[in-house]
Amino acid sequence: MKTIKITQIKSSIGRIPDHKKTLLGLGLRHIGHSVIRQDTPSIRGMIKKISYILKIQEE
């Protein structure tokens, strides 16, 4: 299965609480933090919800 590298590029300060929970659900904690996740529909939905905070790289 394909993987996606997700990097947080903006702060979570002042964001909607639901968006902060989505960041934590992806495993992101601070600016510049990157994680590698499987490319699944649920992960894609989380990315779409907070795409303005993230940088995505297909692997």
UniProtKB/Swiss-Prot annotation:
Transmembrane segments: none annotated. It comes from Buchnera aphidicola subsp. Schizaphis graminum (strain Sg). InterPro entries: Ribo_uL30_ferredoxin-like_sf, Ribosomal_uL30_bac-type, Ribosomal_uL30_ferredoxin-like. GO terms for biological process: translation. PANTHER family: LARGE RIBOSOMAL SUBUNIT PROTEIN UL30M, MITOCHONDRIAL RIBOSOMAL PROTEIN L30. Belongs to the universal ribosomal protein uL30 family. Part of the 50S ribosomal subunit. Pfam families: Ribosomal_L30 (PF00327). This is Large ribosomal subunit protein uL30. The keyword S-adenosyl-L-methionine does not apply. Keywords: Ribonucleoprotein, Ribosomal protein. The keyword Ribonucleoprotein applies. One of its GO terms (cellular component) is cytosolic large ribosomal subunit. GO terms for molecular function: structural constituent of ribosome. CDD domains: Ribosomal_L30 (cd01658). SUPFAM superfamilies: Ribosomal protein L30p/L7e. Signal peptide: none annotated.
